[in-house]
């Protein structure tokens, strides 16, 4: 590798709003504040929910289904 052309690769801490602290390496050069992480994101905690806005799926299926196909 050439000398003097690569950015500094330093250890930083990424702090989540839930209080989780993650130590990692980055070229950013300063600590990061995160909104969500793997400990508090709904997908990873199992609290994710599927929202069907006003029966849109049923409305679509009713409109574009082929009569007599069921």
Curated annotation (Swiss-Prot):
Binds the 23S rRNA. Signal peptide: none annotated. InterPro entries: Ribosomal_bL28/bL31-like_sf (IPR034704), Ribosomal_bL31 (IPR002150), Ribosomal_bL31_A (IPR027491), Ribosomal_bL31_sf (IPR042105). Gene3D superfamilies: Ribosomal protein L31 (4.10.830.30). Zn(2+) binds at residues 16, 18, 37, 40. GO terms for molecular function: metal ion binding; rRNA binding; structural constituent of ribosome. HAMAP family: Ribosomal_bL31_1 (MF_00501). Its cofactor is Zn(2+). Keywords: Metal-binding, Ribonucleoprotein, Ribosomal protein, RNA-binding, rRNA-binding, Zinc. Binds 1 zinc ion per subunit. GO terms for cellular component: ribonucleoprotein complex; ribosome. Belongs to the bacterial ribosomal protein bL31 family. Type A subfamily. It comes from Salmonella typhimurium (strain LT2 / SGSC1412 / ATCC 700720). It comes from the Bacteria. The keyword Ribosomal protein applies. This is Large ribosomal subunit protein bL31.
């Amino acid at each position: 590798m050439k000398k003097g052309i690569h950015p500094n690769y330093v250890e930083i801490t990424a702090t989540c709003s839930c209080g989780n602290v993650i130590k990692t390496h980055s070229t950013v050069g300063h600590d990061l504040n995160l909104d969500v992480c793997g400990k508090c994101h709904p997908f990873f905690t199992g609290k994710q929910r599927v929202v069907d806005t006003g029966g849109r799926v049923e409305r679509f299926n009713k409109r574009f289904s082929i009569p007599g196909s069921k």
